[in-house]
């Protein structure tokens, strides 16, 4: 009986220890197993997704390594687009040694790197980046990148700094004209239009026209006013660059053209308002020799230097003189008095008070007419009326030639008024010369005196001859030439002649002969 009772008790205990089908202990174990299974599957799924993302990044960016792709993926917090932006910056800035390094990894890595290198200061910078080169769905986002001593995590540059774009506020129209080929063609047409209005006789080269147009922001009206002031010789300050109104602030000297908007090469200095346009004229590729700005005092020396310019090879030098060519040279270098010799003198030629303004009044009025035509032509050109602009441009060129002639007349009248009462005598000594070279020198000085109105008298020393009785061969030849040409003269003494010059160019008979004798 005892054994049966003990067996029953053991059986009861074992039954009590076994949980029922709906007991709590059995249900808890099942939940734990299920959660562990789900966690394992989730981790494997995350690992597979991350692995796929990393492989996609490596395929898109062939130059990055797996470590770099993983670091960028972790830094982006699992965001594929952000990771792609980081790697794109990494690839673009990889060849630039001046950029910063990528700082990726956890805060523990940053702390370890800081403690390893000492002063590990890091600053954060944000920049809006848009990357659609590899991923079409990427939108504009803000990327936070840390810079500092943690560059050892990924030893490559990551960010290329955007250059500060400073542009001339005055060059907004220049940016529009230089942007593409069509606008560049319009710019060249504007340059050709301005150059055609100035005419072939203008001393301003195409380089100066192009430079002025560029500095005026490709404003045709403004550039035309500047070019007219430069080409007009009636304004004393026309070549100083101070009256043109191209005032540029000092801040422009520190900024530069945007390389995408203008290809103009500026060749003036930092102080743009003080530009010396006279130097630009003289240093251009196709300079013209001016005739109105020649100094009267240095004119004789210039004429003589031009006439007696020795050739490099004397073997082929002609033994005769082309006096017609000599006269042409004097006309090109000196003041051609023939233009006004047949005209009536200006009524105010001998006015002493305020004579300059009185004599310049006609020339200034003519220049104002020229400017009016040119300004109307520029306005018509800007509005697209090319035909009307061409018509007004032709009218302006005609008025410009009239203004130049008025300038020349005014210059001659002023010279006569200022030099009235001044008696200039040029003395030459032909004593000891042979007849032929002596006559050559005399003809040269006769031409010289006829084209230079400031010389009124020519004193010629001929000598009295070997016998001393006034029978010098040189004197006889000189007298014979003067009588044939109809030039007035008188004897100062037996060995000196005073020749009276009329102060105006005249046609000598020896101009068409190549003989240097008295015949």
From Swiss-Prot:
SUPFAM superfamilies, per database record: SMR domain-like
Residue stretches of biased makeup (Low complexity): 98-127
Positions with biased composition (Basic residues): 1-15
A Pfam entry, by short name: UBA_At5g58720
Coiled-coil regions listed: none
Region (Disordered): 1-47, 92-128
Basic and acidic residues: bias regions: 28-47
Name the UniProt record assigns to this protein: SMR domain-containing protein At5g58720
Organism: Arabidopsis thaliana
Taxonomic lineage of the native organism: Eukaryota, Viridiplantae, Streptophyta, Embryophyta, Tracheophyta
């Amino acid at each position: 009986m005892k054994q049966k009772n003990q067996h029953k008790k053991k059986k009861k205990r074992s039954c009590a220890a076994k949980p029922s089908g709906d007991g709590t202990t059995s249900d808890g174990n099942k939940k734990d197993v299920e959660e562990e299974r789900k966690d394992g599957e989730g981790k494997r799924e995350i690992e597979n997704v991350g692995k796929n993302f990393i492989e996609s990044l490596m395929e898109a960016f062939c130059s990055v390594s797996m470590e770099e792709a993983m670091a960028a993926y972790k830094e982006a917090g699992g965001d594929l687009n952000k990771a792609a932006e980081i790697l794109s910056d990494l690839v673009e800035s990889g060849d630039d040694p001046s950029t910063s390094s990528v700082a990726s990894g956890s805060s523990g890595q940053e702390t370890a790197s800081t403690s390893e290198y000492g002063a590990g200061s890091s600053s954060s910078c944000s920049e809006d980046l848009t990357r659609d080169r590899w991923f079409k769905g990427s939108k504009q986002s803000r990327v936070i990148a840390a810079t500092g001593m943690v560059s050892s995590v990924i030893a490559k540059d990551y960010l290329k700094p955007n250059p500060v774009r400073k542009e001339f506020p005055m060059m907004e129209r220049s940016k529009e004209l230089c942007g593409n080929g069509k606008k560049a063609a319009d710019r060249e047409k504007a340059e050709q239009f301005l150059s055609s209005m100035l005419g072939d006789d203008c001393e301003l080269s195409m380089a100066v026209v192009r430079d002025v147009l560029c500095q005026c922001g490709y404003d045709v009206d403004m550039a035309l006013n500047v070019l007219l002031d430069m080409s007009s010789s009636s304004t004393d300050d026309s070549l100083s660059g101070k009256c043109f109104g191209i005032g540029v602030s000092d801040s422009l000297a520190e900024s530069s053209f945007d390389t995408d908007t203008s290809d103009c090469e500026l060749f003036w200095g930092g102080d743009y308002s003080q530009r010396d346009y006279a130097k630009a004229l003289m240093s251009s590729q196709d300079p013209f020799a001016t005739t109105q700005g020649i100094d009267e005092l240095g004119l004789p020396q210039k004429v003589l230097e031009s006439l007696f310019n020795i050739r490099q090879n004397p073997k082929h030098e002609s033994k005769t003189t082309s006096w017609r060519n000599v006269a042409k040279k004097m006309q090109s270098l000196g003041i051609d008095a023939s233009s006004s010799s047949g005209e009536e003198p200006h009524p105010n030629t001998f006015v002493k008070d305020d004579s300059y303004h009185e004599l310049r009044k006609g020339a200034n009025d003519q220049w104002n007419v020229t400017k009016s035509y040119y300004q109307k032509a520029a306005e018509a050109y800007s509005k697209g009326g090319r035909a009307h602009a061409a018509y007004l441009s032709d009218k302006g060129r005609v008025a410009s030639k009239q203004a130049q002639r008025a300038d020349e007349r005014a210059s001659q009248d002023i010279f006569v008024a200022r030099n009235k009462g001044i008696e200039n005598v040029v003395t030459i000594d032909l004593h000891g010369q042979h007849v032929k070279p002596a006559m050559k020198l005399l003809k040269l000085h006769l031409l010289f005196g006829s084209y230079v109105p400031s010389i009124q008298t020519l004193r010629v020393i001929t000598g009295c001859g070997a016998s001393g009785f006034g029978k010098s061969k040189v004197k006889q030849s000189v007298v014979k030439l003067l009588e044939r040409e109809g030039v007035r003269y008188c004897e100062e003494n037996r060995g000196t002649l005073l020749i009276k010059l009329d102060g105006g160019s005249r046609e000598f008979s020896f101009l068409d002969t190549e003989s240097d004798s008295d015949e």
